[in-house]
Swiss-Prot record:
Entry EC no(s): 2.3.1.234
Keyword Phosphoprotein: no
Entry GO MF terms: iron ion binding; N(6)-L-threonylcarbamoyladenine synthase activity
The protein, known as: tRNA N6-adenosine threonylcarbamoyltransferase
Cellular component, GO, one term: cytoplasm
Source species of the chain: Polaromonas naphthalenivorans (strain CJ2)
Residues involved in substrate binding: L138, V139, S140, G141, G142, D171, G184, N277
GO process annotations (BP): tRNA threonylcarbamoyladenosine modification
Compartment annotation: Cytoplasm
Pfam families (UniProt xref): TsaD
InterPro entries attached to this UniProt entry: ATPase_NBD, Gcp-like_dom, KAE1/TsaD, Peptidase_M22_CS, TsaD
Cofactor note: Binds 1 Fe(2+) ion per subunit.
UniProt main location, coarse: cytoplasm
Assigned protein family: Belongs to the KAE1 / TsaD family.
Amino acid sequence: MLVLGIESSCDETGVALVDTSASPTPCLLAHALYSQIAMHQPYGGVVPELASRDHIRRVLPLTQDVMKSAQHTLADVDVIAYTRGPGLAGALLVGAGVACSLAAALGKPAMGVHHLEGHLLSPFLSADPPEFPFVALLVSGGHTQLMRVDRVGSYELLGETIDDAAGEAFDKSAKLMGMPYPGGPHLARLALGGDGAAFKLPRPLLHSGNLDFSFAGLKTAVLTQAKKLGTELESRKADLAASTQAAIVEVLVKKTLAALSQTALKRLVVAGGVGANALLRSQLNAACQQRGIRVHYPELEFCTDNGAMIAMAAGMRLQAGLVNLDALRGSYTFDVKPRWNLSEFQSEPALATQNA
């Protein structure tokens, strides 16, 4: 069975094709991605209206590229999957509308996919996929969560941020230091030349006794320190960047280790854009190696939003028998969910026609 996946939740347009006849997980046949970073950079962040319009321009040409690369036609596709949420409402509607229109024209079923489930299952796109069960650290621009994953569709929330996500802490701190959008990668690069112990920054909720996160206070501390430095900020920017990164990473690592200890699981999956951070990977790898825990990451190209993870999540749900294809056929109305907690999703079938 061929599954076409479309991602349009924020500022990347992604399309991919997977084959679910492969075992034990679907095989990625082709994928294409277009990033809107350059378009949003002058504004210092994502402009939702511009994002939606650009998705409209890109999604069909990318689909054509994917089908050509995979040496298939749209008529060969069995299921069309799209990101139903969470994300920007207008951007989500573009992907959902295109997916359901194509499905209706081809007489094929369309299914909505949870964006975070896509991130969670993205390591299955690698040559060394994880095995269930595992603890997952989901760290992106908008989400920071620790979850226990027993199988596809079975997710237990262990802890999450109560305010800013880790990715927001990176991006907002970078912006306070005068770095361009998106700030996180710029901050990480600058931190390579700095001293992570130069500034004493808070580690919010580090000793809270639970697995929740908080990064809003850290952002405030960075702002205070930047103002205190004044004209010296430019010469001390690398140190402040390194200290900020060290604070974020320490909290992520220690909370993750606590989750592994609490669940007694020996496998860890790290997914989402922040999962590409070199310091985070280095510290997690070292700590987990000492404890006999295997760590799995997506390939770097699949850390940020992409169509491959959406196609993979849909394909794995189909393989697990969690999707009622008969209920999808012949009805192409749809809705999107800009706010949608993965723990609410659980083993709910991803039906394009389901009500919110």
